[in-house]
Every structure is written in structure tokens, then in C-alpha cells.
A protein has these predicted regions:
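One-carbon transfer enzymes
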Residues: 1-214
Length: 214
């Protein structure tokens, strides 16, 4: 049995692709559904987490074959908001990484990893992720991968971004380049908390799309 744990639109597209190509595929879309389904898992099942936001109890990941997709070149950029943190930090290359889940966040053995450029808007980036995700799932379910440990010496961890961190202040405009600010705006497009500036009346002006002079 294959279980796909996903709820974001782009992740549901991946579920559809898997459903078309494999038998016995099931979808779990919420934490409540996951909790209610645990008793149905068996040791031979593959449980894949794609764009999943909820913490899975250690007892579950140690008992079952739980595999997670993380959009970063693990062991770098473990933790929350990986795409946003990479783009805001000026990274130009990321990766789709599938790893075996353990009790430690994003630290399990890597099963599959492929690089992709962090260019374009979030729609462009998510399209690349979707394409690579299906390739990774196809390889993993067909046992076409080489498992290896993560290099802890190369690891980095970032916290999930909060809506308040999306602000672009006057100081930011003076300090950062047009490309820097463009990166912040493009990585915070819907459905994420958009970049914004606070105007003289105290209201927020949201910046959903931007371009800059090359």
C-alpha cells in the first residue's frame, strides 16, 4: 500500500500522478485523517509526506516506512519555510530531497536528491518541484535509489517564517538591492504571507508581484 500525505495544491497534483502510475494508492489530507488512519498502516507500506506541515510522532516513523520530501539540498536548510529561507538568503540552486524520516527533524538518510534552479516565481518553482517529486517517487517505489547518511558537518537549520517577517521596511529599501527585495517578494507570493510595507496611515500595502531593472 502507498499512502500520500499531502494537502497543498501542487502536492495534490503529485498524488494524481502517482495514482495514475501505481496501484493501491491512498491520500491523507489532514492531521486528523492521518491520526485516524494509523491503525491501517502495515510494515510493508510506503508512507510519503509531500509538503506536509505537521510533526509525525517518533513512534510512528520508527515503526513504519515513512519518507519525506524536503525542498532543499539537505542537510542544508533543515526546518521550516525552506524555499523562502533559501531565496531570501540569495541561494540560486536548491534540490528536491527524499529522506527516510527519524525522530530528528529532517535528519534521516537521504534516498534521492536532484538539484533545480530557484528561478522564476513560486508557480515556476513549484512546477519544477512537482516534476522532480514524481521522478523521485517513481525511483523510490521501484527501489532505484542509493541510501546514504547526511553529512552533519554541512547541516543548517532555519525556523518557519512568521507573517511579521514578511515586512519590507524603509531601512530594508535603503540597505538591500533591487534583486534582494525582488527575491523577498517573489518567494512570498500566495498562498504564503505576502511581503508588505507599512504606510503612513498604519495600513499594510501587500506586494504580490514585482520586477526590477536588470
Amino acid at each position: 500500500m502507498i499512502w500520500i500525505c499531502a494537502y497543498r495544491d501542487w502536492a495534490l497534483d503529485i498524488y494524481d500522478d502517482v495514482l495514475e502510475n501505481f496501484d493501491n494508492v491512498n491520500l491523507i489530507k489532514s492531521q486528523e485523517e492521518f491520526t485516524n488512519t494509523i491503525d491501517s498502516f502495515t510494515a510493508s507500506d510506503s508512507i510519503l509526506f509531500i509538503g506536509w506541515s505537521w510533526i509525525i510522532p517518533t513512534v510512528i516513523v520508527e515503526k513504519f516506512n515513512c519518507i519525506c520530501m524536503h525542498p532543499s539540498p539537505l542537510p542544508k536548510y533543515r526546518g521550516g519555510s525552506p524555499l523562502q529561507n533559501q531565496i531570501i538568503n540569495g541561494e540560486r540552486l536548491s534540490a528536491v530531497t527524499f529522506f527516510r524520516m527519524t525522530g530528528k527533524l529532517d535528519a534521516g538518510n537521504i534516498l534521492w536528491q536532484k538539484a533545480f534552479p530557484l528561478s522564476g516565481n513560486l508557480k515556476d518553482i513549484n512546477f519544477q518541484i512537482k516534476t522532480l517529486c514524481f521522478s523521485g517517487i517513481f525511483d523510490i517505489l521501484n527501489n532505484n535509489y542509493k541510501e546514504h547518511k547526511q553529512d552533519e558537518a554541512q547541516s543548517s537549520y532555519f525556523k518557519r517564517r512568521t507573517p511579521e517577517m514578511s515586512e519590507i521596511s524603509i531601512d530594508d529599501i535603503k540597505l538591500y538591492t533591487a534583486e534582494d527585495l525582488h527575491d523577498k517578494i517573489r518567494c512570498l507570493q500566495d498562498p504564503y504571507p505576502n511581503a508588505f510595507i507599512v504606510c503612513s496611515d498604519g495600513k499594510k500595502l501587500y506586494l504580490k508581484l514585482a520586477d526590477y531593472e536588470k
